[in-house]
Amino acid sequence: MGDTMSAFSDSCMNILGYAGVPDANKEKIYSKIKEFAAMEDQSAPDDAARRLRKELGSYFYELYKLVFFKTLEDRHIPEEIFMFLYFGYIDEELAGEENTQILHDLAVSIGHDEEMRVFTFYQWLRLIYSCKKDPSIDDFSTDYITTLRKRKRDGEITDQQEREALEDGEARVKFEIDNMFRSASKMLSSRVTTFVPFFSGQTLTKPLDKSLLSYATVNKMLSIVKGIDFSLFYRQTVYTAPELGLDKTFIQVEVLPDIILMPLVGTRGAMWQEITGAKRTTPGRFLLPIAEEEDLSGVLIKMCAEFRWELCKRIQGARWNDLSERSLTSDYVDYIDTYRKNRDLSTEAKERIKAAMVKHRKSYKEMFIADYMTYIMYESSGALRHNKVVRAILFNYCPFSKIIREGAIATNPQYVQLIERFVHKTAHEQHLFDIATGRIEKAGNAIPPELMAHYEYLRM
């Protein structure tokens, strides 16, 4: 450990120097970092502590920009810089010796996700800079393109400036840092009211090596959830192939979310957006702290629940709660609105719904999230927790995978009829699919991969 630590004897000055911070500002930031590191209680409620935390927060995001843009020109990025970019590390005293060692070891070995679905925030910004990914929405659910369009409409920029800004890597990255990064960091943090974005060992509630996430861990946990709710990330889209006699065929395509590991310690996750832009077959965005101190499965399931809800609202538009157009959200809203008169609910079930409404402040979305989490975590293994009405809604729109339908709940009286109805519906869809593909094969053509993928979906 000693050899590694000796290389980090003055990380703060090294990082500030790398960023090109002017000497006067460098000394000021350095002194504030050291003052913060020396505090016995960095979450102290007094005015001086609050001012210091606020000041450090204002330094962090501007420093992150400077460091990021400098790395674009550097083929030999120092290890301390990666530690800053991946984890928010700034100072060995603030982090603590053991934590500094752990962060160093991960920073030099982190690599890339082979499935290209999970990214560090630094990797994510590079994709945005190179226009391979678009900046995320801001706090008002407005994306970068819409923001530029509004600025042009308001006369702030010209048509030419708008076109240039769309491909301006620096402007794109600044939009991401100034909007999503600033807001999401505090949202994900384990200390919302006393949040400081620089990494501090004092904020940890468990050993750091037990909370740091890897690409493999996140991908594995997401696969477990998908193994229960198989249709979670599938979207219905239209497939056309006139040369095969297919003018308008509805198929299901899986669109997995982009998952970004944010450089902070936290206890939450955020389903930041359900799609990218206006196209419905684009990836959503899930955010996780790179050091997640809560149980990852619960955090991820909660994000998936919110994704289910928000994607349905997006697809349904203004009619998301209109029962004349049946959907997950409209059926669930009706269930909550009419529970008092619902004869399929026992008195005990009605009391539970009433209590849940109080707990979740009458938020349909929050109530659904809680019910979905129970459905995935308990009902999928045969441990019944739900009443028959909400169970039917969830199974109708979020059916369990085949291995669960034929396993844990196969003979459960509460699920037998639901499963039979699902099997009948799927068999009908498979029959129609067989007719369509039969015509294609009869004409001597190969079945397109998109249709084969849809066939696999029908067998899940």
For the regions a language model picked out, list residue spans one by one.
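Feature targets compositionally biased, intrinsically disordered low-complexity regions
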Residues: 1, 16-19
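Non-Sec secretion/translocation targeting segments of pathogen effectors
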Residues: 1-6, 460
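Large, modular interaction/toxin scaffolds in secreted and membrane-associated proteins
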Residues: 2, 41-46
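Active-site-flanking segments in enzyme catalytic domains
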Residues: 9-12, 17, 30, 37, ...
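Long, low-complexity intrinsically disordered regions enriched in Ser/Thr, Asp/Glu, Pro/Gly
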Residues: 59-61
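C-terminal flanking tails of non-heme Fe-dependent oxygenases
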Residues: 226-230
